[in-house]
Amino acid sequence: MAAEFDGKIESKGLNPGLIVLLVIGGLLLTFLVGNFILYTYAQKNLPPRKKKPVSKKKMKKEKMKQGVQVPGE
């Protein structure tokens, strides 16, 4: 019985679905590692972001809420 199957077993190589999964997984892993490296580099070397300047109108409103007299009024 074992002699019947000797010639019929062939090596087909890797499954095409497995190859696609490995390629997509590799690309995703490369993307995530690259993002992490860029993020750590930016945290060390880039200056902190500047805050937006507060408008004079908003400053007056805040001071009015606190009850402080606004100069010039």
Curated annotation (Swiss-Prot):
Residues 47-63 have a biased composition (Basic residues). It holds the Pfam family S1FA. GO terms for molecular function: DNA binding. A motif (Nuclear localization signal) lies at residues 47-52. Its main location: nucleus. Coiled coil: none annotated. It is found in: Nucleus. Residues 47-73 are annotated as: Disordered. The keyword Nucleus applies. InterPro entries: S1FA_DNA-bd (IPR006779). The keyword Transcription applies. Keywords: DNA-binding, Nucleus, Repressor, Transcription, Transcription regulation. One of its GO terms (cellular component) is nucleus. GO terms for biological process: regulation of DNA-templated transcription. DNA-binding protein that specifically recognizes a negative element (S1F) within the RPS1 promoter. Belongs to the S1FA transcription factor family. This is DNA-binding protein S1FA3. It comes from Arabidopsis thaliana. The lineage of its organism: Eukaryota, Viridiplantae, Streptophyta, Embryophyta, Tracheophyta.
